[in-house]
Amino acid sequence: MDSISKYDNKCAIHKEHKIKMICATCKDVVCNECILLDHNGHKFGRIDVENSKEIFEEFKNNHLQNLDKQIGINNELLNESNNLFKSLEDKHTENVNTITEVFKELPKLLPIIEIDKIKQLVTLYDENKDINTNISTIVHDYSNNINLITNKYKNTINQINIDQIINDNNSYQHIEILKHCCQSRLLIKDNQNENKINELMDQYKNVNFVNNSEQVKESIKEIFEISNSLSITNVKDPKRVIAGGKECFIYKNDSIIPNGTTHLAIAPSVKTIKIGSIPTSVKYLVLLDGFNVQLKEGMLPQSITHLFVGAIKKPLLKGSIPNGVTDLSLLDGFNQKITEIPQSTVHLYLFDTPLTNFPFQNFILRTSKYKQQFAHPKVKDWNLSTWEPKIEL
């Protein structure tokens, strides 16, 4: 191996181009493509003893020992990703099995629809699988880069005489060392790797699976509805909620609701609700998207008259809706089973929900967002745009 090919002098980003200069703004080695694309407008300098020594000392004293820590962080993120993907995979299997069982009872025409619905599920599953694969690849690549650098220098770093290498005009070894110095900084700089993995994890999609088999006589092609949304782990607490014409106090996990509060929104970060924790002054209550507590009788006070329910993650069981509620609004994305609506409820408001079967005999008011067809003796179309809660994330 000749002295030219012995050392890696290629750009870590633009791998076909050789490192030419140092960006004085970023203190990074750059190739011609870097100068044109990624460092446009920056100041550049020739590679010399002074700037080389500065970069090397930073690598030697700060970056090298932190590279192993980065592998641990990456592996933790990978484990979190794998666990999340496993739950999505299990749900995928459950959904496919449900579709298969229902379609076994239907005539020969229905397997065509079955294939289409499963294809939708598989497409979403493949997207989640691709995300998981991408995260695994990123962690693997970063780990390889880290191992390459640590294995090369961890036992020799104190024996490297950068001054001698530079003075001996061994430019290829010199530039390789500079490259690894700068590359190590990028591997741990500003948590870029963690941010990239978290951004990919935010793209995981839950499958919103609604079984409408009881309505097969009305619309056989709508037995199952398949859509997707970001995983529940990605649902964020809002900054501001307005409902019933007034700003709500946002109840977050472990927060205390002030006495006298009349308008309340419960954030998705809330893990438990103790009976008596919500004051009886509350009249308007919003259950926000991602709310994941199984409501039981007594958790919500009887003082609530107006209940707004978003895309929550648990069904509304018997007794979970307070008997004082007069107006119940099912907001965009609500797709949970409702076991019972209390007799106190006078109006049921429907926004963009896929449900068509409600245990309710009083007036149903549906917005233009509601696209489902269903028979009910007291249903009316209504403009409820001013009634819909305003949520600022």
UniProtKB/Swiss-Prot annotation:
Keywords: Metal-binding, Zinc, Zinc-finger. One of its GO terms (molecular function) is zinc ion binding. InterPro entries: DDB_G0279899-like, FNIP, Znf_B-box. Transmembrane segments: none annotated. The keyword Cell division does not apply. A zinc finger (B box-type) spans 6-47. Pfam families: FNIP, zf-B_box. The keyword Disulfide bond does not apply. CDD domains: Bbox2. Zn(2+) binds at C11, H14, C34, H39. This is Uncharacterized protein DDB_G0279899.
